[in-house]
């Protein structure tokens, strides 16, 4: 940890800008416009894995997007709880084998490709094929909140949860969301938009406190497009306030008050991609049961020491021990 006083400064920090006055109205109306379940296909796959049913799920998203997800359900006569997993920025859904660990505990797992990134989901009328990840944060920001690219990603999350909750195999009272970086952000958004989500695990969540990102000068690959917008389109920042006001509608910290279920967060204090201060802006706005674990020596990197076991315990109610105790 480079600055021992960092935690003290962040413990009450809630972000640079406030939630737009019409924020909840905006999102409630966007959800209300999704009047019914979208068209979807759930196709079983034969992977010769005993005791697990494997499916590919595709559905029609907003703006004619096509959304792809992988689904595992334990083979049982009982309805199963489900964990929704979301991947990092520019990535894709879990490999099939990565999903198996949770089925051992009796959980279904759903892992979704974010449209326009590296998986099979596509963006319909705006960019029908291929990876369009660069520029997704600011896409639509000049036109206004309704045109934001991430608005459609967030609505994909809501519809995915509704589809899965409607399936006969699923216990829709026991749904959880999980992810890291962009995935952590989407796990929180899923809980903020769909009250079916009762538990969330978010590791170093992305997409928070955009004005602070600008002030810090975070030119990491994840936020590069934000800085390129100003450098090459608005070098005197004449549109900064308007752009920030628009991006506020997809800022994760602004969804925090909508989350009702338990939230567990993990942050690394050396994170120079999703700076800790922007993560605290989310956590300090949460009004639900919550826990925040800090890893002082970690940056925006794989957290493989004890973290996966803790996440498993949080999501599955298991009691995996983290330390060897000699008996």
Protein language model features and the residues they cover:
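N-terminal targeting or regulatory segments adjacent to alpha/beta-hydrolase or S9 domains
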Residues: 1-51, 324-327
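Hydrolase active-site cap/lid region
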Residues: 189-237, 294
């Amino acid at each position: 940890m480079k600055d021992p006083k960092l935690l003290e400064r962040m413990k009450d920090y809630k972000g640079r800008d406030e939630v737009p006055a019409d924020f909840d109205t905006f999102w409630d109306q966007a959800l209300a416009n999704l009047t019914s379940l979208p068209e979807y296909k759930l196709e079983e796959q034969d992977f010769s894995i005993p005791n697990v049913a494997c499916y590919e799920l595709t559905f029609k998203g907003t703006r004619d997007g096509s959304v792809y997800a992988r689904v595992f359900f334990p083979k049982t006569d009982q309805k199963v709880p489900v964990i929704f997993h979301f991947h990092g920025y520019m990535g894709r859904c879990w490999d099939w084998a990565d999903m198996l660990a949770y089925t051992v505990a009796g959980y279904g797992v759903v892992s979704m490709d974010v449209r326009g990134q590296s998986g099979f989901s596509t963006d319909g009328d705006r960019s029908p094929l291929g990876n369009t990840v660069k520029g997704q944060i600011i896409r639509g920001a000049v036109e206004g909140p309704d045109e934001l690219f991430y608005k459609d990603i967030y609505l994909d999350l809501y519809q995915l949860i509704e589809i899965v909750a409607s399936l006969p195999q699923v216990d829709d009272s026991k749904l959880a969301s999980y992810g890291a970086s962009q995935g952590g952000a989407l796990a929180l958004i899923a809980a903020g938009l769909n009250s079916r989500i009762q538990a969330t695990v978010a590791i170093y969540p992305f997409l928070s406190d955009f004005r602070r990102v600008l002030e810090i000068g975070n030119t990491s690959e994840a936020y590069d497009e934000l800085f390129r917008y100003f450098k090459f389109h608005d070098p005197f920042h004449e549109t900064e306030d308007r752009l920030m006001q628009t991006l506020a509608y997809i800022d994760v910290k602004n969804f925090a008050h909508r989350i009702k279920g338990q939230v567990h967060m993990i942050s690394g204090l050396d994170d120079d991609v999703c700076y800790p201060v922007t993560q605290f802006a989310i956590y300090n706005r949460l009004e639900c049961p919550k826990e925040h674990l800090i890893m002082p020596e970690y940056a925006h990197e794989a957290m493989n020491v004890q973290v996966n076991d803790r996440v498993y315990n949080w999501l599955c109610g298991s009691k995996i021990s983290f330390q060897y105790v000699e008996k």
